[in-house]
Amino acid sequence: MAISAKLVKELREKTGAGMMDCKKALTETDGDIDKAIDYLREKGIAKAAKKADRIAAEGLVHVEVKDNEAAIVEINSETDFVARNEGFQELVKEIANHILDSKVETVDALMESKLSSGKTVDERMKEAISTIGEKLSIRRFSIRTKTDNDAFGAYLHMGGRIGVLTVVEGTTDEEAAKDVAMHIAAINPKYVSSEQVSEEEINHEREVLKQQALNEGKPEKIVEKMVEGRLRKYLQEICAVDQNFVKNPDETVEAFLKAKGGKLTDFVRYEVGEGMEKREENFAEEVKGQMK
């Protein structure tokens, strides 16, 4: 199949590999991005790539906590300018509070639910769009609960570009829970612990690491030991509790919380626009279009 320049560019952005290496990888894997990433890793050309798409869309993430319930929500706008608008920021907080009050479970149900003003969220969003002059959309939200003996940690980075909500059991130390939320914002783990990693993912990673070691010309008798060592390192990179704590790299996140009598049981991390692609605009073409 013909490999487009756009596909090569996407693979380069995800792996940091050279153009020709990316083109060859895509050719060998029939244009499958995920398989091409594995191909490059097995050849030792690229490190493990987080298979998240480019961060592109604008907007805000907000975390709202009320007693034993907390909500995290992402609302998108078209420009960063609007994301800094006070009216938009108030809208995001209003929606986050309503999510907790209404106990809705899906975005569709949220849009149909009524605010205290009697208007639906959908009507409120349309009002805001009319006032602000940009397309706005509620992309996603999550609700978490805890007991009186636990703590929520809420952290917003860059004014809401990244938002994290943590649930820590066994302690009411909100500051410690917030510190862990800050760690998760910075390091971006995929899981709480290795117990959450599927057997399928572990087996897939083990196979990639094995091929990588064999392609490096390592003797087969030591490959198994190398693979297990690298697999442990991989799990440490993607599991929050096993990572070196960002505020004190001499201890793990698990050890930090254990000293406080707590244990991380859940987290939600939203980054504005992750997995979304921004419309690519050609400025010259845009000007031409306005002159017609």
From Swiss-Prot:
InterPro entries: EF-Ts_dimer_sf (IPR036402), Transl_elong_EFTs/EF1B (IPR001816), Transl_elong_EFTs/EF1B_dimer (IPR014039), Transl_elong_Ts_CS (IPR018101), UBA-like_sf (IPR009060). The keyword Cytoplasm applies. Pfam families: EF_TS (PF00889). GO terms for molecular function: translation elongation factor activity. It comes from the Bacteria. GO terms for cellular component: cytoplasm. Keywords: Cytoplasm, Elongation factor, Protein biosynthesis. Residues 79-82 are annotated as: Involved in Mg(2+) ion dislocation from EF-Tu. SUPFAM superfamilies: Elongation factor Ts (EF-Ts), dimerisation domain, UBA-like. It is found in: Cytoplasm. Associates with the EF-Tu.GDP complex and induces the exchange of GDP to GTP. It remains bound to the aminoacyl-tRNA.EF-Tu.GTP complex up to the GTP hydrolysis stage on the ribosome. HAMAP family: EF_Ts. NCBIfam families: tsf. Belongs to the EF-Ts family. This is Elongation factor Ts.
